[in-house]
Amino acid sequence: MKLHKKIAAVMLCAALLFATACGTAPAQEQSATPDSSTPTIRFLLRGTASGMDRVLDALYAQMDDDHRWQLDFTFVDSGDYAQQLARSLTAHDNYDFVFDAPWQSLAMQTEQKNYKNLKNYFNNPEYPALQAAFSEEYLAANTISGGLYAIPFTNTYYDVPGIFYRKDLLQTLGLPFDEITNRAEMEQYWAAVRKKGEMKPISLGSRGFYQYNLPEITLRQNGIWVSQGWSFWDYPSQILLSSDGKQVLDVVFPGDSNEHFAALPERYQTNFLDVYLQQNAADSQWLSPDDLLQENGARVFLLGQSASYEASLASGTGQVQQQLRTIVPEGEVAFWAYDDAFLPQNRAQGSIPTTYAAWNDLCVPSYSTNTIEAMRFLDWLYSDWSRIDLFNYGVEGTDWQVVGDEEYTLLQPMGESFRFPSYELAWNPQHHRIDTALPDAEKALLEFTFDQSSYAASPLAGFTLNTTPIAIEIAGLNSLYAEYYTAFGHGAYGAQTQEKIDELHTRSEAIGLETVRAEIIRQIQTHLDKNSAE
């Protein structure tokens, strides 16, 4: 079989070993055992990877004559991935699996019939490992119009967002605390870093402050939800449900009038979406102008050039710290979850409302002629959790070591360290490990999110917005908001923020905002009525 390397034009389309190239750049081959009869499974994924040669060697060593494939990965830098995916699907590029997500283009691509319905491959005894790893309930929560057009990947039903920060740096700043536990302490830390003048207080990526000023789980606990099927980041909106979950009270947008909110029940009368964008503007004092151009705030942090960055917890601070120490040997990384719903005293059974929908997926292009072979590979991959561990942690004994039944420790391999966007292939609610070196508080937070009893089903579970009746309006709104997205997310409008919110709302009304509002309300109420009747 052949292994190939692909290098992206922008950053690093892959730090990998596989064939072809981003766009039309020539491929660079690397040695491997050639076998032209071996089926090839081709992936188009988002992000970067390293240390994959040894991972694939270990994976190939487990294959036999009846289960043998050559894997070919194309990695595209996160900032360019959405456009590359659209181009590849339009051009019918030869991929068997492509990454997509509800927050990216999953609903749109599905409605355009660009993905295959994979329902027959799951809950199917001919694919026993997939049947075991993907429960019927989990799949049901991830269907679109009754079909399974995306294979859902999540290691937990909520990945906690927060701020990764330099704990070693904090301890040199003379502040009266040695860890960050609230917003006031975080701002004191940023202020002290700025005063010292050696690095940026925080580096943000393309998603800006993300949920820092709009804590999602706290909102859910108060009956406020985003719509599955139309990403909040394509155009911000929130669904307001009654306290019993049986009625949709409204769908609200930035720029809705104060009178609009005043007509709602008391707990919804704050124009919280405007407040969210205004708070982003207030917090922009901590940013540098070039943050608007950064795709990933972690890169600046890992180079030792910023004191913090915003991201979701994923597997914890361990791998982040390992990468930082290649540049900053004394670096120590900690994490603060900025949603108060995750304070230790607020954690309880059923305290995380969820739809059980995954936020990352693999899809099979509708034109693929290799689907059976691709699904055979996926079934084989999931037939042994040790294979999944390869894509989560690297090679055991080189990159990591088992500790007990559910923990692991990271090792320092010779050469490049392992890195792979495992959320695109190897996350599953049934299989977890926790880095044994993590602080006890961080372990406890991960254990809480891994525990399925921490979750409670939302009345919106199983609902996905059918955008077909409002496709023209939503396309127009998405295109319009793209003009504002980066500046709103980073607070770059400053004192002009409210003016820009009002401008967005006026322009949105002209291209169908009220039509969209009415249709979302209608569809959700139909869903809630169906729930009540069952």
Where are each of the predicted segments found?
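Extracytoplasmic/secretory soluble proteins
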Residues: 2-3, 12, 16-534
